Amino acid sequence: MIQISNLILAADVSPEVAGSSGFNMIASFFAAALLIVIPAAAFLIFVSQKDSLERTSATRRR
């Protein structure tokens, strides 16, 4: 079984480049979470809470 370090050396990729690439990939995951996932989740929670309040007030009117 080929170890990761042997695979990186066989591909002529320096450890610095591989580390930088890995760091940038993880940083992009965090950026995506901040820019897309968290606002979308907040919006969905807001809408579901608002809908719940509207349904509650609608049942009180009956």
From Swiss-Prot:
One of its GO terms (biological process) is photosynthesis. GO terms for cellular component: photosystem II; plasma membrane-derived thylakoid membrane. It is found in: Cellular thylakoid membrane. Its main location: membrane. It comes from the Bacteria. The chain crosses the membrane at residues 26-46. Pfam families: PsbX. InterPro entries: PSII_PsbX, PSII_PsbX_type_2_subfam. It is a single-pass membrane protein. Involved in the binding and/or turnover of quinones at the Q(B) site of Photosystem II. This is Photosystem II reaction center X protein. The lineage of its organism: Bacteria, Bacillati, Cyanobacteriota, Cyanophyceae, Synechococcales.
